[in-house]
């Protein structure tokens, strides 16, 4: 946590803290917390385990590959969510397919491609990319949609993504010495 004591004083507050996510895994964003947690939870469920029973070493092991096999995680993104999914898939020895909408900045495309994902810029808007990615996931053997947008019938994985984002709050609670008021 970054202690913004001067800003706190200026605002008439006892203290002000900011959770800086710009250094997490070298990705400059918190979004990886959601996608990676949802992917781990999906894998655990497929193996009949609770996510608390598996750790990073197991998720990246040959044993997991033998027990779970290979999945392809699909998503649509404007940038950071897709990069997080691609990063997690790469670390877990899984595949990622990321669809990006027209007008996407090349640097965002490149950042995702560097993580080993199959990434494309589609000539459609973000919402249509979500629909396309979901259709591809449904048509692909062991395809899994990992989207931070929910719709009727697709709520579980987005909820897991939100739970993954909660890691920030848990970490902040561990790092702060005084109980926050708000």
Residue ranges, per PLM feature:
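PLP-dependent amino-acid enzyme catalytic core
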Residues: 1-182
């Amino acid at each position: 946590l970054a202690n913004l004591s001067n800003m706190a004083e200026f605002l008439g507050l006892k203290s002000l803290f900011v959770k800086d996510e710009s250094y997490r895994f070298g990705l400059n964003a918190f979004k990886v917390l959601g996608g990676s947690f949802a992917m781990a939870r999906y894998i655990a469920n497929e193996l009949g385990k609770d996510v608390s029973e598996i750790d990073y070493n197991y998720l990246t092991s040959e044993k997991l590959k033998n027990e779970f096999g290979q999945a392809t995680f699909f998503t649509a993104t404007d940038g950071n969510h897709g990069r997080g999914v691609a990063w997690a898939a790469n670390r877990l020895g899984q595949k990622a397919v990321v669809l990006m909408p027209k007008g996407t900045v090349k640097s965002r495309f490149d950042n995702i491609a560097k993580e080993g994902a199959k990434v494309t810029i589609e000539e459609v808007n973000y919402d249509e990319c979500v629909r396309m990615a979901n259709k591809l996931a449904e048509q692909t053997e062991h395809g899994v949609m990992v989207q931070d947008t929910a719709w009727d019938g697709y709520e579980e994985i987005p909820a897991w993504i939100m739970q993954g984002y909660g890691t920030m709050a848990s970490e902040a609670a561990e790092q702060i010495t005084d109980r926050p008021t708000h």
